[in-house]
Regions:
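Phospho-regulated, low-complexity intrinsically disordered regions of nuclear gene-regulatory
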Residues: 2-28, 37, 42-114
């Protein structure tokens, strides 16, 4: 009897991203402060395979905005866990609204390079 491989968690998918590459991309962002939508866009653009697989984890939710929200939450948890390695620190958990990858405006965390 064949076994079906376990579905990877969002955390496992994000941990596939090379931390040094992500840290370098974050450090290349203009300015010292930025919101988490900037990092969402970096991951979507430079780590497209992982980003697409994250979206697939939440495809059952069907609504694209809800899927994006879930992916963003998981990326936020990842950033918080690996902030030191990424050389960033969170300076505000609910900053000013900014535009996300869906073109919608939502509140997001503010981060600073360290």
């Amino acid at each position: 009897m064949a076994t079906i491989p376990a579905r990877p968690s969002a955390r496992a998918i994000l941990e596939e991203i090379d931390m040094r590459d992500l840290a370098a991309l974050i450090q290349a962002v203009d300015g010292t402060e930025f919101d988490s939508h900037v990092i969402d866009e970096i991951i979507e653009t430079h780590f497209n395979d992982q980003y697409d697989r994250l979206r697939m984890l939440y495809v059952y939710k069907q609504d694209p905005e809800t899927i994006t929200h879930e992916v963003t939450k998981q990326i936020g948890k990842y950033l918080s866990k690996y902030a030191d390695e990424l050389r960033i620190e969170q300076i505000m958990s609910r900053g000013e609204p900014t535009r996300n990858s869906n073109g919608k405006t939502s509140r997001t965390s503010k981060w600073r390079k360290i």
